[in-house]
From Swiss-Prot:
Gene3D superfamilies: N-(1-d-carboxylethyl)-l-norvaline Dehydrogenase, domain 2, NAD(P)-binding Rossmann-like Domain. InterPro entries: 6-PGluconate_DH-like_C_sf, 6PGD_dom2, G3P_DH_NAD-dep, G3P_DH_NAD-dep_C, G3P_DH_NAD-dep_N, NAD(P)-bd_dom_sf. It comes from Pseudomonas fluorescens (strain ATCC BAA-477 / NRRL B-23932 / Pf-5). GO terms for molecular function: glycerol-3-phosphate dehydrogenase [NAD(P)+] activity; NAD binding. One of its GO terms (biological process) is glycerol-3-phosphate biosynthetic process. Pfam families: NAD_Gly3P_dh_C (PF07479), NAD_Gly3P_dh_N (PF01210). Pathway: Membrane lipid metabolism; glycerophospholipid metabolism. NCBIfam families: PRK00094.1-2, PRK00094.1-4, PRK00094.2-4. This is Glycerol-3-phosphate dehydrogenase [NAD(P)+]. It catalyses: sn-glycerol 3-phosphate + NAD(+) = dihydroxyacetone phosphate + NADH + H(+); sn-glycerol 3-phosphate + NADP(+) = dihydroxyacetone phosphate + NADPH + H(+). Belongs to the NAD-dependent glycerol-3-phosphate dehydrogenase family.
Length: 341
């Protein structure tokens, strides 16, 4: 009997670790690659990722490794959970090894220099690979603690979607499929910006009306932008859009929410990110999204307002006053009503 090939998870962060555990619990051998040999040794010895998922036991079938070449050679299904700033530099030298492999991005970010999503970078590096993304309301710790969770795997490759569903679907983790890879991935990247705003609002003691307004206007804003890029607006009414937006803007477990909360408490951006100790993709996404929205002429007042606070020296009160005095627009303007006649 031929032994099953291991599944690779690239990245030693919280979500990569949670996904590695899920795969192992479903009976798969998993190789989790990380750069830091000390982190790999700590997981190997203590069966715990103390920096990113303290208190969560790592399944015995998860093997922490630091040899990327061997990991890629041995696996045909790879989940990529690398920070957006590192993905290209880590994988580009090994482009030939990625030919024909199934590469599924778990990273919700945008590359600063190119405004490319992670799956687009994977396609640049390995045009012969089969590409997908996994996104949705998936807080890493809750996934690791087996809270009931649903996610979306998106790809034009139906067989890839089925393979990922079979690998991850379990008693507490439900995997839906979508063909709108771009929309699913864009939703996951954009919502990080609005989670920072939501965290600030909570820290400042703003009411439930305000939080509801922020979330719904954020949905309108991010969908408006996505539609301008060719995404399907209906994608944003599902798990990868409104689902991910709600959980990220409502939970103190969200990294971007934590950054916003710290900012609302009076910390500087540098202090807030240092306190977090992990990558908060929303900060980087905000910078490139503000520029791109201006280039395209897409109306994104919440993005402009947060950028003004973090990078242009404006106070929160100044931005709030400007936003509330702005001319009201149509409530839902990103779906044509002709489609519902």
């Amino acid at each position: 009997m031929t032994q099953q090939r291991p599944i690779a998870v690239l990245g030693g962060g919280s979500f990569g670790t949670a996904v590695a555990n899920l795969l192992a619990e479903n009976g798969h051998r998993v190789r989790q690659w990380m750069r830091d040999p000390e982190q790999a040794e700590a997981i190997r010895v203590n069966r715990e990722n103390p920096r990113y998922l303290k208190g969560i036991k790592i399944h015995p079938a998860v093997e922490p490794v630091t040899d990327l070449l061997a990991t890629l050679n041995d696996s045909d299904l790879c989940f990529v959970a690398l920070p957006s700033s590192a993905l290209r530099s880590v994988l580009a030298p090994h482009a030939e090894l990625l030919r024909g492999k199934l590469l599924v991005s778990l990273t919700k970010g945008i590359e600063a220099q190119t405004f490319k999503l992670m799956s687009e970078i994977l396609q640049d590096i390995a045009p012969q690979a089969r590409i997908g993304v996994l996104s949705g309301p998936n807080l890493a710790r809750e996934v690791a603690e087996h809270a009931l969770t649903a996610t979306v795997v998106a790809s034009e490759d139906e067989e890839l979607c089925q393979r990922v569903q079979a690998a991850l679907h379990g008693r507490t983790f439900r995997v839906y499929a979508s063909a709108d890879r771009f929309g699913v991935e864009l939703g996951g990247a954009l919502k990080n910006v609005y989670a920072i705003i939501a965290g600030m609002a909570v820290a400042l003691g703003m009411g439930e009306n305000t939080k509801s307004m922020l979330i719904t206007r954020a949905l309108a804003e991010m969908t408006r932008f996505a539609v301008s890029q060719g995404a399907n607006p209906m994608t944003f009414l599902g798990l990868a859009g409104v689902g991910d937006l709600i959980v990220t803007c409502s939970s103190p477990k969200s990294r971007n929410y934590q950054v916003g909360f710290a900012l609302g408490q009076g910390l500087s951006l540098e202090e807030a990110v240092t306190r977090l100790g992990e990558v908060a993709e929303g900060v980087n996404t905000l910078k490139v999204l503000k520029v791109k929205a201006q280039e395209l002429g897409v109306y994104m007042p919440l993005v402009a307002g947060l950028h003004a606070i973090l990078f242009e020296g404006r106070t929160l009160n100044q931005v709030i006053e400007l936003l509330m005095r702005g001319e009201p627009k149509t409530d839902v303007d990103f779906i044509s009503t002709s489609g519902f006649n």
